[in-house]
């Protein structure tokens, strides 16, 4: 099994991003890792930002860095706008919009956006906050 290696420029790679790389880039903390993360994000041909990583980034920005909801959404939109980032962009942007404007937790906002983008008809949940978004039906189990 291959071990870790220091990555420089290798065009044509497809690489999954971990939360810590995105957070270092967005926060500048700590400075040396932030510089490396920013350089890495700028030089890769295709970097995949998984939905779960974006969700964890939101959690870290809010809980560790105490970034407010609008600031968190803005930072994540900036990450999604990077030309090297590949993601379910439309779905995630809609989830961020719901998270920010309708004030749902990101997991519920993501579920609402997923319903809107698929042929799924409703969400089974006890969370009444979902009712703030009129585009989906919540079913109480």
Region annotations inferred by a language model:
Residues 22, 54, 130-131:
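A generic structural signal for short hydrophobic patches within well-formed alpha-helices
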């Amino acid at each position: 099994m291959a071990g870790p290696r220091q990555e420089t420029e290798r065009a044509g790679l497809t690489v999954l991003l971990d939360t810590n790389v995105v957070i270092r880039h967005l926060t500048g903390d700590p400075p040396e890792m932030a510089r490396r993360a920013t350089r890495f994000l700028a030089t890769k041909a295709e970097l995949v930002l998984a939905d779960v990583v974006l969700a964890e980034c939101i959690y870290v920005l809010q809980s560790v860095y105490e970034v407010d909801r609008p600031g968190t959404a803005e930072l994540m939109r900036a990450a999604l706008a990077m030309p090297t980032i590949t993601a379910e962009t439309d779905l995630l942007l809609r989830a961020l919009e719901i998270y920010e404007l309708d004030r749902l937790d990101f997991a519920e906002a993501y579920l609402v956006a997923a319903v809107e983008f698929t042929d799924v008809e409703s969400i089974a949940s006890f969370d009444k906050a979902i009712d703030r978004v009129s585009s989906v039906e919540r079913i109480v189990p």
